[in-house]
Amino acid sequence: MSAASSFVLFPMGEKHYALPAHRVTELARVDQQQVIPHTTPFVTGVLVRRGEVIPVWDIAPSLVGPDAPARKFYLIARRRFGSAEESTAIPVTGDCELLNRQMTAPVAKTAPYVEGLLALENEVVEVINLETLAAEVAS
């Protein structure tokens, strides 16, 4: 696709996934999540971080199925809704890593929410498009 870019690599069970680094604002330890009544798919509650109410959006069921291991951290990422943007807390199962790689185009058999692939030494990592994933979950 283009020159190397920065990505945040995160574990979800046995696999790794990535988000473009410019979308990620922080990695946080699991805080006290507040459960609130709602009907939004995969939203499991909210966190209050630095005075901001942040929805917790557990994407593990979409990526690895219902048997994903316990989440250890929250990856706080920016997600767009039309012209608006908000923070979203994504529970992940382990330590995250910042890396520079060239993203290649996804192959035909990847899910629609995969915007590209990163070739690592022992794994091909899917780069997730949060907006496409949200649209897929909502439908």
Predicted regions, residues:
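An acidic, low-aromatic, low-complexity terminal/linker signal
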Residues: M1-S139
